Every structure is written in C-alpha cells, then in structure tokens.
Amino acid sequence: MTRRSIYFLPLALMALLGVGASADDDNRPLRIRNAPEFDGVTRWINSKPLTMKALKGKVVVVHFWTNGCFNCVNNYEHYRAWQERYADKDVVIIGIHSPETASEHDIARIEKQAEKHKLKFPIAVDNETRNWEAWKNKVWPTVYVVDRRGVVRYGWEGELNFKGQKGEETVRKVIDSLLAETTAKGTR
C-alpha cells in the first residue's frame, strides 16, 4: 500500500458512508434525539419553572444564548417575532442563558438584558451549564426545535441570518411543518 493510499482510503470510506459536510448542509447540529429535561436551572425569568414533560403536546423552540454574545443579540428580533407569530398556537419559545464568562452569571444583568431587548419568553438561567451539557451544545447562539413528542427535530448553530444565511426562515418553516404535521395527524 502506498503512502497516497493510506491518506486516500479513509477519505474514500467517509465519502461512501456520507460522513462530512457538504455545500447543501443546512446547519443541523443534532447531537441528541430526545429533548433533555431542564436541569439545575438557577432561576426562571418571565415564567414559573417549566419541564419538557409538561410541554409535551407543544412545539418547543429552545435557544441557547449569553449576554456577551453579539450574534445572540442579533437573533433577539427573530425570537420576539416567533413569540408574537405563534402566540395563539401550541408553540413555546424558551431561552436558556448559559454563561461563558464569570460576569455573565449575574442574574440582575440577565434580567436587565431581557427587559432592554423586550425578551418576554421564559428564560432558564443555566449558571451551572448543566443544560448546555445535557443538550451537548457547542456554540452561542444555538436554536433547537422540539416536536410535540419531545423529539429534537432540528437545530441551527450560530446567528440565524449571518452573511445572508436563511436561518430564521428555515427554523420558521420547521416550526410550521411540525404544527401542520401534528395537526394533520389529529394529535393537537
């Protein structure tokens, strides 16, 4: 076997198995199947404590963010729009604030950020990052869409519309699709 073959063989195997990224990837960071329970939440803002079990039967949009992340701030308008658009539907928007730095553990600062940017949806303060770890999250911001059975069906890493990407539109279509899917099956 030549040196060239040693390098080529693993790449060929990956191609055969469909492993790797392609230009058609639509940003699906799914590392889990079932949505984990909210665990170790330091405090809930804008809501009483929520559980994934109690949210079964609803489409749940979970987004991870932190105060010091400008990409997270750029996503706020989309979260607010979804909150308004789906207010009369079985959709729940939940923010999970998982800090990156020591200063981001400050609950008063998180509340101030939520008030300043009119974030009215439930926010779980994840100061111990137990939810971050349970969801196997990697970057801020990340958005997950969970179906009515509690199965994570879609995920988007990073700013939704960064450099012309269509993340907001894609996530919205996933939400609409899940609402139509469950309505068509009569499982509202």
Which residues fall in each region the model found?
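Structural microenvironment flanking redox-active thiols in thiol-disulfide oxidoreductases
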Residues: V73-H117, N127-A134
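N-terminal "domain-start" segment that seeds a small globular fold
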Residues: A23-M52
